[in-house]
Amino acid sequence: MKKAILFFLTFLFITRESIVAQRFLADVDSSFYIKDTVRPVIKRFANLRITGYIQPQFQVASANGIESYEGGSFSAHSQSRFMLRRARVKIEYALPSKTSGNPAAFFAFQVDGTERGVAVRDMFLKLFETRKNKFSFTAGLFGRPFGYEVNLSSAYREMPERGRMSQILMPRERDIGAMVSFEPMNKKNKLSNFKFDLGLFNGQGLTGSTDFDSRKDLISRVYCKPYELNDFSISGGLSFLNGGWKNGTKYVYKNGVGQNGDAIFIVDSTQANIDEIAPRRYYGADIQVKKEFKWGATEFRAEYWFGTQPGTSSTSTSPGVLPVANGNPLPTYIRHFNGAFFYFLQNIINEKHQLLLKYDWYDPNVKVKKQQIGKPGTNLTPADIKFATSGIGYIYHLNKQTRVILSYSMVSNEITAMPGFASQLSDNVFTCRLHFIF
């Protein structure tokens, strides 16, 4: 009974500390670095953390059965739904260092349980260099170190979902791999405000159970942590991904120009294309600016990606398995893309009320435009259509752990010559979410 009471008291102490601890995927809970008079009393559980959050929500779409990136597509005969978007529990353990106040090792395990099933979201080990406290090594299943929006935890993200581009190019945000990080822990170090990550990953993420080829994704990111000047702060980063996957056939489609001047896909059917690597290459830049006031804060975020993405005729989504149809590999389509995310966050009256504005776009094929898509002989498909989403939202913070989120996402698509896309689709979504974190 005594042990149970001690564990319960420790759990309460831990969760109260961790409410604002871990904002980004694969980061270490900052409360592990806190020294106080309580921890020595309950040493057995002092380095264990249990955290989590739950997001029940109700949604209404503008039509039945729409394809949506606001928590997934709707059923064919439904335009409203209750759903448990996320319900996650995370267990973390830090092994104290004998030579410094920083951990020597850190382990994290996170599961997500909803009406759609239970899945592992994080499982990784992080080892720290404890002599100069500048380097760390991470291995396992963890967040890809690319961009700001991808790495911002859904426990803290203001709008209900990440942008369409994030979900297509980086489905489920995480991957299996290993990463080296440079992040000086000593605040006196001139580079303590910078973090550099360099990792090697399978590439398929959580959408596949194993690597379907031997090609790995090299991902790197340099990030400048918030630089503060009075009530103003600015931060930003640069990201790079270099990877790809093997062609399953000799047919590789690339952008070109037809005899009549139209943008088209031209097929290369050289036998040597089989098992060659279809390039996957991303470049990204992001910036975050924040101004604090006595009654709240104003924040602006901007992020831009561009690069090359392999796919099939029907999709530009990063695959979890080798794309096939009826057991036969599909031809590869090489597209050049760009996209961006913009956030504007504004407290109203006080910190309990927050206005949200968001705009994002994803153009999967910047070489083609509008009425070119759908013309006979171009080999262009709905996978080449540009989409943009404008979102408006409101958050009411009941307390530090509970908030209500109301948002409305308005989706627009390119008007093309493609049947079904000759006008704007009706695919807007209203979301009402209750968010609780512990």
For each predicted feature, which ranges?
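Short, charged N-terminal helix-start/capping segments
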Residues: 22-55, 113-117, 214-224, 270-282, ...
